């Protein structure tokens, strides 16, 4: 196996991403008076479906001993889908989040840590113990891998279309020097 320093750097960057996502989520305060916003409910439904679909794909990669493919799928799921989309959608403006979205997010984080653990055991073990209080001797290493729930491929597809539209709009705004903060009329 050839040593490539850029792979070490990529691993470091991924570790930082995982740690910072954890810090972001744990930095939120729950406001019991806030009902779950519609955009958060949609994001939860999408990510739950996507996570279940991904678990099936990752399980298939493991069964066929395609460890590199499994890792790449987990990497993209965490970095692109969980951090860049899900967390950005649900991120509360004032640091206060509704309980339902917060609890679902911790469940997702727990499942993601279990998926990442075979490849990055130390950081995932540390964060898993910090997510909630664990019993003496309890270890992420001894936990079952998450199982896929029933999910809607149609919902995933619809959400992907919405993401594509958003990316296109952002690209047009940037190419035309239109402020990303200003309102934009779409037809």
Predicted stretch roles:
Residues 1-13, 63-64, 68-69, 152-160:
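Conserved phosphate-binding loops in nucleotide/dinucleotide-binding enzymes
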Residues 13-26, 44-54, 71-92:
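Core structural elements
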Residues 52, 66, 74, 169-173:
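Long hydrophobic segments that form regular secondary structure
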Residues 62-63, 94, 173:
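Hydrophobic residues in alpha-helical segments
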Residues 1-40, 132-136, 174-181:
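Catalytic adenosine-cofactor/nucleotide-binding cores of aminoacyl-tRNA synthetases and other
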Residues 31-59, 87-167, 182, 187:
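Acidic, turn-prone loop/beta-hairpin segments
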Residues 69-73, 180-185:
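Short amphipathic alpha-helical interface segments
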Residues 1-26, 72, 103-125, 129:
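Structured ligand/cofactor/substrate-binding pocket environments in proteins
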């Amino acid at each position: 196996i050839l040593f490539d320093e850029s792979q070490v750097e990529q691993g470091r960057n991924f570790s930082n991403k995982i740690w910072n996502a954890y810090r972001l989520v744990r930095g939120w305060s729950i406001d019991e008076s806030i009902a779950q916003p519609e955009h958060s409910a949609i994001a939860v439904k999408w990510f739950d479906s996507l996570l279940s679909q991904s678990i099936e794909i990752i399980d298939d990669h493991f069964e066929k001993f395609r460890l590199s493919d499994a890792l790449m799928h987990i990497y993209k799921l965490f970095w692109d889908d969980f951090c860049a989309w899900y967390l950005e959608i649900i991120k509360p403006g004032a640091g206060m989040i509704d309980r339902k979205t917060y609890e679902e997010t911790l469940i997702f984080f727990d499942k993601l840590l279990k998926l990442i653990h075979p490849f990055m055991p130390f950081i995932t073990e540390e964060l898993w113990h910090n997510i909630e209080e664990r019993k003496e001797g309890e270890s992420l290493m001894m936990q079952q891998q998450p199982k896929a729930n029933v999910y809607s491929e149609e919902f995933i597809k619809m959400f992907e279309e919405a993401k594509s539209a958003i990316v296109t709009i952002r690209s047009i705004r940037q190419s035309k020097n239109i402020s990303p903060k200003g309102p934009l009329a779409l037809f």
